[in-house]
């Protein structure tokens, strides 16, 4: 399978997984996003991604565009993560979902990758 695939084991899918990340995860902030990062020493390798986009961001077309751009960023850059972590991304109100681009996501999230890789992840 292609190295650019995004398998099911790289996704946060269930409410308990999201709740655990919200409660115990570390918050990181950018201009347009809030990231909840929960490092773990065991489980699937690499990063698992969860996306939460509120209905306040606009109609389904806009919300799906935001999620599509963010998934694309993580799918293409999945190899630069050096930790095992669950990451939830929540767009802030300042983000205009109609004009979000891959370049904007990369500009804001690339510095966060460095911070995520430096997090203390259970002695790894």
UniProtKB/Swiss-Prot annotation:
One of its GO terms (biological process) is tRNA 5'-leader removal. Keywords: Endonuclease, Hydrolase, Nuclease, RNA-binding, tRNA processing. NCBIfam families: rnpA (TIGR00188). Belongs to the RnpA family. Gene3D superfamilies: 3.30.230.10. This is Ribonuclease P protein component. Coiled coil: none annotated. One of its GO terms (cellular component) is ribonuclease P complex. GO terms for molecular function: 3'-tRNA processing endoribonuclease activity; ribonuclease P activity; tRNA binding. Its EC number is 3.1.26.5. RNaseP catalyzes the removal of the 5'-leader sequence from pre-tRNA to produce the mature 5'-terminus. It can also cleave other RNA substrates such as 4.5S RNA. The protein component plays an auxiliary but essential role in vivo by binding to the 5'-leader sequence and broadening the substrate specificity of the ribozyme. Consists of a catalytic RNA component (M1 or rnpB) and a protein subunit. It holds the Pfam family Ribonuclease_P. It catalyses: Endonucleolytic cleavage of RNA, removing 5'-extranucleotides from tRNA precursor. The gene is rnpA. It comes from the Bacteria.
């Amino acid at each position: 399978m292609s190295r650019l695939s995004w398998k099911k084991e790289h996704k946060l899918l269930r409410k308990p997984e999201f709740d655990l990340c919200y409660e115990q995860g570390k918050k990181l902030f950018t201009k347009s996003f809030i990231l909840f990062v929960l490092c773990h020493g065991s489980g699937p390798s690499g990063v698992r991604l969860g996306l939460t986009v509120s209905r306040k961001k606009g109609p389904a077309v806009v919300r799906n565009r935001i999620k599509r751009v963010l998934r694309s960023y993580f799918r293409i850059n999945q190899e630069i993560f050096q930790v095992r972590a669950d990451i939830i991304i929540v767009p802030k109100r300042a983000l205009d979902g109609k004009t979000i681009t891959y370049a904007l996501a990369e500009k804001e999230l690339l510095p966060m990758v460095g911070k995520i890789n430096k997090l203390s992840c259970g002695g790894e």
